[in-house]
């Protein structure tokens, strides 16, 4: 197995953060990201970049973090008990984008690297990440294109890669208490190291680089779509699912909070405005009901493109 090079991973992640922020500023056309660097008492730190009240994006947060610690947190050792007691180093770029227009989907992406060390033993390391899409008023062609981009970036690494990580994404971004997926999925991978450092790193780079390629065309296509109070109210209601998932199920959120991460950066994924409504049910045969009937259970989206 090739030896992990932490400095090369960090350089890529910092560059990725910059490129994604540049791309989002270009899409917005007005607002700019504000950078906020922070240090963590136990070791490490990061830079959070947040764009607010833009022409296109109500809020977009793109966070880089590189943290170190003397012992692995419970969230990381729950499914890897053999790592308990090891020192660790974790770095990644994580982003969530909440658009103004309900016809533009919310999106999330994350790429990360983790290494755990113990004197007298080989380091244990892995990559993880992915991206997913959460529409409010979905367009089938947008969802198919999103999955086509995900498929195409996976293909050089093997034909089995996209179906495997697409299913993992569907399974991960699922709310059991609602019996629905958070959105229409994408890719999710974790514990990636079996192919060695170089190949694993190359795949993580492909996912990071592929995010804007997949998301930007959807934003361009939908950003001028007219909407009213009804659509806005539905968007705010559905944003509640984002909050529910992130605070109850998301491993990254739990890891950040358990390792003494910076709370503001961890919770910047939260939508700036959100609403809940008791016993809400969409009107039958309405555009809102289409989301529930056609988009919140896993589908083979690429088969619909044939």
UniProtKB/Swiss-Prot annotation:
Pathway: Porphyrin-containing compound metabolism; protoporphyrin-IX biosynthesis; protoporphyrinogen-IX from coproporphyrinogen-III (O2 route): step 1/1
Class of this enzyme: oxidoreductase
Pfam families given in the database record: Coprogen_oxidas
Subcellular localization: Cytoplasm
Keyword hit for Repressor: no
InterPro entries per the UniProt record, alphabetical: Coprogen_oxidase_aer, Coprogen_oxidase_aer_sf, Coprogen_oxidase_CS
EC numbers: 1.3.3.3
Keywords: Cytoplasm, Heme biosynthesis, Metal-binding, Oxidoreductase, Porphyrin biosynthesis
GO biological process, one term: protoporphyrinogen IX biosynthetic process
Essential cofactor(s): a divalent metal cation
Region (Important for dimerization) residue spans: 242-277
Site, Important for dimerization: residue positions: 177
GO molecular function: coproporphyrinogen oxidase activity; metal ion binding; protein homodimerization activity
Catalysed reactions, as listed in the record: coproporphyrinogen III + O2 + 2 H(+) = protoporphyrinogen IX + 2 CO2 + 2 H2O
Binding site for a divalent metal cation: 98, 108, 147, 177
PANTHER family (UniProt xref): COPROPORPHYRINOGEN III OXIDASE, MITOCHONDRIAL, OXYGEN-DEPENDENT COPROPORPHYRINOGEN-III OXIDASE, MITOCHONDRIAL
Self-association and partners: Homodimer.
Family according to the record: Belongs to the aerobic coproporphyrinogen-III oxidase family.
Known role: Involved in the heme biosynthesis. Catalyzes the aerobic oxidative decarboxylation of propionate groups of rings A and B of coproporphyrinogen-III to yield the vinyl groups in protoporphyrinogen-IX.
Protein name: Oxygen-dependent coproporphyrinogen-III oxidase
Gene behind this protein: hemF
């Amino acid at each position: 197995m090739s030896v992990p090079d932490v400095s090369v991973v960090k350089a890529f992640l910092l560059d990725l953060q910059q490129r994604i922020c540049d791309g989002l500023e270009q899409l917005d056309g007005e607002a700019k990201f504000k950078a906020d660097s922070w240090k963590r008492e136990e070791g490490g730190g990061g830079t959070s970049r947040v764009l607010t009240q833009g022409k296109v994006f109500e809020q977009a947060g793109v966070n880089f973090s590189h943290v170190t610690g003397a012992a692995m947190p419970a969230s990381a050792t729950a499914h890897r008990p053999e790592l308990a007691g090891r020192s660790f180093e974790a770095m990644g770029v994580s982003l969530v984008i909440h658009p103004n227009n309900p016809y533009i989907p919310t999106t999330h992406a994350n790429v990360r690297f983790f290494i755990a060390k113990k004197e007298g033993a080989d380091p244990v390391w892995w990559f993880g990440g992915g991206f997913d899409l959460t529409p409010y008023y979905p367009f089938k062609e947008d969802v198919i294109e999103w999955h086509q981009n995900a498929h195409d970036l996976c293909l050089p690494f093997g034909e089995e890669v996209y179906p495997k990580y697409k299913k993992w994404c569907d399974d991960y971004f699922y709310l059991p208490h609602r019996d629905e997926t958070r959105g229409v999925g994408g890719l999710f991978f974790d514990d990636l190291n079996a192919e060695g450092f170089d190949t694993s790193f190359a795949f993580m780079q492909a996912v990071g680089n592929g995010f804007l390629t997949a998301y930007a065309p959807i934003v361009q296509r939908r950003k001028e779509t007219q909407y009213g109070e009804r659509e806005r109210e539905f968007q705010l209601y559905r944003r509640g699912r984002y909050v529910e998932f992130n605070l109850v199920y998301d491993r990254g959120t739990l890891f950040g909070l358990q390792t003494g991460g910076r709370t503001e950066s961890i919770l910047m994924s939260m939508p700036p405005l959100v609403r809940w409504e008791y016993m809400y049910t969409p009107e039958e045969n309405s555009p809102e009901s289409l989301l529930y009937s056609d988009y919140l259970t896993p589908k083979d989206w690429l088969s619909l493109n044939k």
